[in-house]
Amino acid sequence: MDGARDWLLERTKRPALRLLHATPAGEALLVRLYLEAERHAERAAPWEPMLANAPRWLAAWLDRHRAEERRHAELFAGRLRALTAETDEADDAGDARSGFDAVSRRKLAALHRLVVAAAPAFGAGALVPALAIAWRMEEMGVRVFARHVDVLACDRPDAPLLPVLQVVLADERRHARACRRSVERLVNDRERPALAALVERIDRIERRLGVLGALLLLTSGGLLWMRAKLRRTATRRIAASPR
């Protein structure tokens, strides 16, 4: 079942990326979603208070991680300004964004419940599930950005967004490795089966909501492309009509 779901995600998201890059509004939607994700990562997740008792080595790494997420947000904000000319963010993609926001809220709520439920299974408490979620979300980010880099490198190698994504992808790969090392450092041998079960539950939440997000991407890309085409057709007709 998971293999079929992964196949569907891949077959849906690549065409969605191509459709979204067919219009400036579509690319702006993608960049805005990335920007919001990076800003969320910079502020840390809703379970940040549970990390208040993190050991010094972990707190220092979290500070560095947050600084890099802030840099990613600045890169995406710069690209968004170039696309939108710093106009109001309310545009044709607004309805699509609200759909993605709803998916994100559902995912965050499910993950927050998981942190609370899993914490008693580990000597380090909520630190372990919170960092395990960070690890798996970073791994998801690596897949998202790697897919996008691959699509642009093949279809639009001169796209201004490509070097931005390449920088972010390199950092996300490093973040994923660091998160995994941090989690493994916090658990003992007896807790490793519980950690494996926790990771499977995290991945299950991501897979379940990932299909919905992919379909929203594809639908939004198609709608924005159709809207842009209709506008171009209307403009040509107006220009060709007798004065």
Region annotations inferred by a language model:
Residues M1-R243:
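Non-heme di-metal
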